[in-house]
């Protein structure tokens, strides 16, 4: 279980980091262009101001004709740490509960407590329900499931042969009706 959880978490961190282009460091220390432009330190000099592509290649921010350095984003960092903490905590809880149940099953400890053993007798409940269901089903078949108009024929086929097999319309047997060996 741990063997599958750690690579999954690593893959998540790797994918998150590759979105920013900063790698995993971008997950733990995210940078942002948010905030006031005028409080920031300029980036790339005059050439970056004149060429926005150069500014972005230097991994700086460009807004309103100003190229400036990014700042660490503390709110995003807190969100990332919160998500990482809950993911690791949930994974740890899942692994420990699986191990606990596995251990308890091996020790044959997964039984109902003594105070619940006598109170939950399902066999009696099921038998009572099945008796009630029998009378209910009899009522349903007599009322709803049998068609109201059945074709009545004078001679009913008692031998068990299907229609056209061994009998004629009048109920007489044909030559192929019985096998005589």
Curated annotation (Swiss-Prot):
**Does the entry annotate any disulfide bonds, and if so which pairs?**
33-61, 43-60, 55-67
One Pfam annotation reads TMEM190
Q: Which residues lie on this side of the membrane: Cytoplasmic?
A: 103-181
Q: Under the cellular component aspect of Gene Ontology, which terms does the record hold?
A: inner acrosomal membrane
Where is the sequence biased in composition, kind Acidic residues? 170-181
Region: Disordered, residue numbers: 135-181
What topology does the record note for this protein and the membrane?
Single-pass type I membrane protein
Transmembrane spans: 82-102
Gene Ontology molecular function terms on file: identical protein binding
Give the signal peptide as a residue range, or say none if absent. Answer: 1-21
Residues exposed to the Extracellular side: 22-81
Listed name of the protein: Transmembrane protein 190
Q: Which gene encodes it?
A: TMEM190
